[in-house]
Design a protein with these regions (language model features):
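Basic nucleic-acid-binding interfaces
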Residues: 1-140
Length: 140
């Protein structure tokens, strides 16, 4: 029974449909994360529903910014290192956030963390300072 195989006949069409579906998922995940960030910014509280961890990572939002209500420390949590299922909504992470400086001061884990927003880059990632002639700082 000769003739072209099903892979040869339909392979390109199926791969193109898979690629369109992947792009559509990325756009939808990005929109959900942006909407959640806007709700967090404008409502100022734990906005529900929140996107799942996997959707945030798929959209490129790798970090979750958390603020301690006690010492006003802002930290970024890398979502790719969490030991939680990817289907876990982000708002459920708030109950597990502990502020390290406040906990060390008290001597036991102390919960004061509040979710701020999802971020694409880490908080410590910033542009290099402009260099000026005569600047005495060490430049490596």
């Amino acid at each position: 029974m000769g003739g072209p195989s099903k892979e040869r006949v339909w392979g390109a069409t199926i791969r193109a449909a898979d690629e369109r579906a992947r792009e559509t998922r990325h756009v939808a995940d990005n929109a959900a994360c942006e909407a959640w960030n806007m709700r967090m910014q404008h409502y100022g509280g734990p906005a529900q529903p929140s996107p799942p961890i996997g959707d945030a990572i798929n959209a490129g939002f790798r970090y979750l910014e958390v603020k301690c209500a006690g010492c006003n420390t802002h930290s970024a949590v890398d979502l790719t290192t969490l030991r939680r299922p990817r289907e876990t909504p982000i708002w459920q992470l708030e109950q597990r956030m502990r502020c390290r400086p406040c906990s060390e001061m008290r001597g036991y884990p102390y919960k004061r963390g509040h979710l701020v927003r999802l971020r694409r880059t880490n908080i410590t990632t910033r542009q290099a300072d402009a260099w000026y002639p005569g600047d005495q700082r060490d430049r490596n």
